[in-house]
């Protein structure tokens, strides 16, 4: 994608407004996962080492816009950044009229959602944020699907607008996987409902060579193939849609394989018994909660032969140990495959980490909604404006 990259610019002495995604989960004021902070650290360090006067901007949670709320303050993030960077990272509450930052240093601006106009992407707030900097760096892939003042309007009015290292890496990985993939291209889409991923399934069914479906989504395809699903979660009104997607994949020279066997239980609960059944033998009082070993072996074969793998969503209820074997097998197959693989989405990342294969997946996306929207073929507003600015330069 044609965007200006931060790494191509001279930052020395420049005011750099660095938009990161530091929207970390908090419990009683304590950070429960610093994954997003760790992902942003290399970009922050790089901007400081290049001599930039760095103002870091992020949102946190969903406060009432325009009102300060201690519960959504970035104070815990500032403390965490201070520890990680080995220097005091000031949290600046009132920054909209300008902040003095020394060359090679950084400050953290308070939650951008405390500013009126952020969510509405107002021109006024965009111009005021742009006035804070010489260079605007969009590095928050996790917020790239949102047209908001700190992700979009500011990029319209900043003297220079570019992609940070994290955003650039995300775009490069997604381009490699979808725009210029090595074939066979295999998609893995899991999740509970077809309705939430219909656009995604539709887009991928025309592009991939094989589309593996899992979780509750797979039940619609099992039903469309003429099998019973018992008490399993599925959407009766979308069975025809599943049949259409299977036909569309075949027409495009691809395939959406239906599981050969499944793991069933009477309910989704701790201690619920797990039984392997052929897909044709699911009982009326049983729920499909994972793929079976024969299906896992089939999917492994497909994944080991792949050139590129795009993965969003687990294939079973892996939070329960007895229904996690399929997702574990899938994780190991992706890790063992010589293909370039990209995985994204909260549940997928949790599975990859749980089964210890994170270091063997080609790229793990930091974006949930943005990753999904890119896979759906939608334009990401924060990326589109960077492309526009690059074309004008």
Curated annotation (Swiss-Prot):
Residue positions annotated to bind substrate are 21-23, 36, 59-62, 113, 146
* Pathway(s) annotated for this protein in UniProt: Carbohydrate degradation; glycolysis; pyruvate from D-glyceraldehyde 3-phosphate: step 2/5
Offer one example of a GO biological process linked to this entry. Answer: gluconeogenesis
Which Enzyme Commission numbers does its entry carry? Answer: 2.7.2.3
Instruction: Give GO terms: molecular function aspect only.
Output: ADP binding; ATP binding; phosphoglycerate kinase activity
- List the subcellular locations: Cytoplasm
Give the UniProt keywords, A-Z. ATP-binding, Cytoplasm, Glycolysis, Kinase, Nucleotide-binding, Transferase
Q: What is its main location?
A: cytoplasm
Q: Name the reaction it catalyses.
A: (2R)-3-phosphoglycerate + ATP = (2R)-3-phospho-glyceroyl phosphate + ADP
SUPFAM superfamilies xref list? Phosphoglycerate kinase
What Pfam families would the database entry show?
Answer: PGK
| Residues that hold ATP according to the record | 197, 319, 345-348
Gene Ontology CC terms, in alphabetical order: cytosol
Q: What class of enzyme is it?
A: transferase
Task: Give the record's family classification.
Answer: Belongs to the phosphoglycerate kinase family.
Listed under subunit, the entry gives:
Monomer.
Name of the protein this chain belongs to = Phosphoglycerate kinase
What's the name of its gene?
pgk
């Amino acid at each position: 994608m044609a965007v200006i990259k931060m790494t191509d610019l001279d930052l020395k002495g420049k005011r750099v407004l660095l938009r990161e995604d530091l929207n970390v989960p908090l419990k009683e004021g304590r950070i429960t996962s610093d994954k997003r902070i760790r992902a942003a650290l290399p970009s922050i360090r790089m901007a400081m080492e290049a001599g930039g006067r760095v103002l870091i901007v992020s949102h946190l949670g969903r406060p009432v816009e325009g009102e300060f709320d201690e519960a959504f303050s970035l104070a815990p993030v500032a403390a965490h950044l201070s520890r990680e960077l080995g220097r005091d990272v000031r949290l600046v509450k009132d920054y909209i009229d300008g902040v003095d930052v020394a060359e090679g240093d950084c400050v953290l601006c308070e939650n951008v959602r405390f500013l009126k106009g952020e969510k509405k992407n107002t021109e006024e707030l965009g111009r005021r944020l742009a006035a804070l900097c010489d260079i605007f760096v969009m590095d928050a892939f996790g917020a790239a699907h949102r047209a908001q003042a700190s992700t979009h309007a500011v990029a319209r009015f900043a003297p220079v607008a570019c992609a940070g290292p994290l955003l650039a890496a995300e775009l490069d990985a997604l381009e490699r996987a979808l725009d210029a993939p090595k074939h066979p291209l295999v998609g893995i889409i899991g999740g509970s409902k077809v309705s939430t991923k219909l656009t995604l399934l539709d887009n991928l069914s025309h592009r991939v060579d094989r589309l593996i479906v899992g979780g509750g989504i797979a039940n619609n395809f099992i039903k469309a193939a003429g099998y019973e699903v018992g008490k399993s979660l599925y959407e009766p009104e979308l069975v025809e849609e599943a049949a259409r997607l299977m036909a569309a994949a075949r027409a495009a020279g691809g395939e959406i394989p239906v599981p050969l066997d499944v793991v069933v239980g009477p309910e989704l609960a701790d201690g619920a018994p797990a039984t392997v059944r052929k897909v044709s033998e699911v009982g009326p009082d049983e729920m499909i909660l994972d793929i079976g070993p024969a299906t896992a072996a089939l999917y492994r074969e497909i994944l080991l032969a792949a050139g590129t793998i795009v993965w969003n969503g687990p294939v079973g209820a892996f939070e329960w140990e007895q229904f996690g074997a399929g997702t574990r097998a899938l994780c190991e197959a992706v890790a063992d495959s010589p293909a370039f693989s990209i995985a994204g989405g909260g549940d997928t990342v949790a599975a990859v980490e749980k089964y210890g294969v994170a270091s063997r997946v080609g790229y793990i996306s930091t974006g949930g909604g943005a990753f999904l929207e890119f896979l759906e073929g939608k334009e990401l507003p924060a990326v589109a404006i960077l492309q526009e600015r690059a074309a004008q330069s």
